[in-house]
Amino acid sequence: MHKIIRVLALVYASSVSDTAMVQAADHQTKPTIVLVHGAFAESSSWNDVIAQLNRHGYRTIAAANPLRSVAGDAAAVSSVIRSLQGPVVLVGHSYGGPVITEAAHGKSNVKALVYVAGFAPDTGESSLSLSGQFPGSTLSDALLPLARPDGGKELYIQQEKFHEQFAADVPAARANLMAATQRPVTEAALAEPSNAASWKTIPSYAIYGSADRNIPPAVMKFMADRAHAVKTIVIDGASHALMVSHPGEVAALIEEAAKAP
């Protein structure tokens, strides 16, 4: 009886070890997903997307975006990319789009760019210049500008307008938490021209909502078409915060980008 138990224990241990080795090997072959939040948000906005990606075996990093300047913010994300081995998929929401576009420049391990209601600027374009190309944004009326010591402006969305403006399809209780924890962006960062257009050489994917009030959907369609995005998804009725309201669809597109040859 004791011999049988010992044999079963050895078989079980071997099975667990083999499973762990397979899982470890699978984890190493999959790209690391680096997610970059935009203005008026913070890293936890990716939580539900991360949960799904982690369940499917992906390593994920929600990078802290300083929201100070495109060049400086891209440098911060670039330092994260340089620390990683193997392929990387960069995901940017809103103003995070210009940041990943610049951060990916010259990085041979970045295999895809995923724009989640994000700007995909060409060289010389800014978030503000792109947003103004088509009508539809109501963001300017919802902003709360605060003076900076250097004479510039720090921009928030007024808390009482946050739900309707930024996250209309998110439950009110959660939208109120997002409003309270939002991180401001400098006005200068939104007006800063991009120095790179990595989507010209790296496959890109786009997903956005038809009811986005921050970035006109027509702008996002224009950018996706111009970049010849591998796949573009438009979620009917989705707000600017679709990584919160539609994490399943966002995660699925990221996985598709990660699995592409």
Per-segment meaning from a language model:
Residues 29-70, 88, 106:
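Conserved HGGG/HGGXW glycine-rich cap/lid loop of the alpha/beta-hydrolase fold
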Residues 31, 199-204, 227-230:
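Short, proline-enriched alpha-helix->beta-strand connector loops that line the catalytic pocket
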Residues 91-92, 96, 100:
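Gly/Ala-rich beta-loop-alpha elbow adjacent to hydrolase catalytic centers
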Residues 109-110, 114-150, 155, 159, ...:
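Flexible "cap/lid" loop of the alpha/beta hydrolase fold
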Residues 177-198:
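Active-site nucleophile elbow and catalytic-triad environment of alpha/beta-hydrolase enzymes
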Residues 206-208:
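Short beta-strand/loop motif that positions the catalytic acidic residue
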Residues 210-238:
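Conserved loop-alpha-helix segment in the C-terminal half of the alpha/beta-hydrolase fold
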Residues 238-247:
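Catalytic histidine-centered segment of alpha/beta-hydrolase-like enzymes
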